[in-house]
């Protein structure tokens, strides 16, 4: 009896030891795999799939394509019950208002195919009672915008600047950056508008209408008083551990780590991080330049053959947006980025982003950020980080109604933006010509 008990205890101990050994082996393997660069592993192997599954790599298109919008609207408007209200250049108001009208856009962007139309047809639709308007800075692919809004209508051949929908005539109008108009038939129920009214809080406005030089769908706010602060730049040191910058997070955004080999240039004003797949040049003042070496990369939007067409662009945009959000948080810039243009050149796609402060674009002579993909692989990226602070002074912009009246025949749209002026960044109203965006 005692021998049987001792045998049972020994068996239990042996099983426990075996389990512990197996667990230790698994932990050691996981620890080793965590230190391996994803780019150094062949894509179609069990090891690469395990790395992706455990450490957030390519875990499937459904995970990478989040559906989160990468572009912030410049203006939104909702017309119902005999009045038109709108919001502009305010991140919080934009987020709340866009959520309120999203269901309308889902229906408006799920209609028939787009066909080219004329200005008068749009002008006639602008007087409808139930309307919505959505305007972006730049040139955003139509299919991408439709996907963000939950729509099913696709067209991979055009980019959009402004979308307008009239529920009264069941017409969707799309304005391209070149000024071309497209129209689609789409139905949206009245109940969707009624629900949107409960959460959409804007200021009274009107459409410019026909007869002027600006586009007829241009929003003119009643008694507009757009007052914005003047900005100054603050010193940025990406290498200062005490300055609040997360260098490890900056490196991690590009698939590198604090253990990645680097060398210094210009008396340590620039550090160049190098591994087998890529090079990241990091200037302490905020300029980041990423390039790949050979066919590999530490950043991928999707695996070869995983997605094609519009889904590929969606994944590229989502990858760039996520990376850029991580960089901006790590550098504590208090700004955010908005997709501005998508440029195709053969097998390569370049995504260009604007920098926004408080919802207002900050314009420079060079792009704030750009990402070049070849298929799912990030080949190059440039980010010009800046940190701003209000000077304590402010400036009131010329109201859109007055600015629209002063527009020349080739100045069809307007935007508010910051530009460098006498040592500060000052807000002003700018005119845009057809084709200037993107």
PLM region spans:
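Short, Lys/Arg-rich cytosolic juxtamembrane segment immediately N-terminal
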Residues: 8-12
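Short low-polarity hydrophobic stretches
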Residues: 25-29, 320, 371, 438
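Exposed beta-strand-loop-beta-strand "reactive/processing" segments of non-cytosolic proteins
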Residues: 247-292, 331-386, 415-438
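Preferential activation on post-signal-peptide N-terminal prodomains/segments
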Residues: 2-6, 16-312
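Short, non-transmembrane alpha-helical segments in secretory-pathway proteins
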Residues: 94-112, 119, 233-255, 304-346, ...
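Zymogen propeptides/activation segments of proteases
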Residues: 18, 149-153, 157-206, 317, ...
């Amino acid at each position: 009896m005692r021998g049987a008990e001792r045998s049972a205890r020994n068996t239990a101990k042996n099983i426990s030891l075996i389990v512990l050994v197996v667990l230790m082996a698994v932990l050691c393997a996981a620890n080793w795999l965590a230190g391996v660069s994803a780019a150094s592993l062949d894509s179609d192997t069990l090891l690469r799939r395990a790395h992706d599954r455990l450490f957030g790599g390519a875990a499937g298109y459904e995970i990478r394509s989040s559906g989160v919008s990468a572009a912030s609207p410049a203006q939104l408007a909702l017309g119902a019950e005999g009045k038109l209200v709108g919001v502009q250049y305010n991140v919080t108001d934009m987020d709340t208002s866009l959520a309120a009208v999203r269901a309308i856009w889902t229906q408006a962007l799920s209609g028939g195919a787009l066909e080219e139309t004329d200005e008068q047809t749009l002008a006639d639709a602008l007087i409808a009672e139930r309307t919505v308007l959505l305007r972006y800075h730049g040139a955003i692919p139509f299919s991408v915008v439709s996907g963000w809004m939950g729509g099913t209508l696709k067209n991979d051949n055009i980019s959009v600047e402004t979308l307008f929908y009239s529920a009264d005539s069941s017409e969707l109008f799309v304005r391209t950056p070149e000024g071309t108009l497209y129209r689609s038939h789409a139905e949206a129920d009245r109940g969707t508008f009624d629900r949107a009214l409960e959460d959409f809080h804007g200021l009274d406005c009107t459409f410019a209408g026909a007869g002027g030089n600006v586009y007829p769908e241009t929003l003119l706010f009643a008694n507009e008083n757009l007052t914005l602060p003047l900005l100054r730049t603050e010193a940025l040191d990406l290498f200062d551990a005490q300055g609040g910058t997360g260098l490890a997070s900056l490196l991690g955004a590009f698939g590198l780590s604090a253990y990645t080999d680097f060398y210094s240039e210009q008396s340590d004003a620039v550090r160049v991080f190098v591994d087998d797949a890529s090079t990241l040049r990091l200037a302490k003042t905020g300029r980041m330049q990423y390039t790949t070496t050979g066919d590999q990369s530490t950043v991928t939007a999707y695996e070869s053959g995983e997605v094609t067409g519009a889904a590929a662009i969606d994944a590229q945009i989502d990858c760039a947006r996520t990376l850029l959000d991580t960089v901006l948080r790590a550098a504590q810039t208090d700004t955010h980025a908005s997709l501005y243009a998508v440029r195709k050149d053969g097998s390569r796609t370049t995504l260009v982003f604007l920098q926004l402060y408080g919802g207002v674009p900050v314009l420079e002579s060079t792009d704030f950020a750009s990402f070049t993909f070849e298929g799912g692989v990030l080949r190059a990226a440039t980010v010009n980080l800046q940190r701003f602070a209000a000077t304590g002074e402010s400036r009131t912009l010329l109201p859109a109604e007055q600015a629209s009246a002063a527009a020349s025949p080739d100045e069809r749209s307007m935007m508010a933006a910051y530009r460098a002026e006498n040592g500060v960044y000052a807000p002003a109203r700018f005119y845009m010509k057809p084709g200037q965006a993107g």
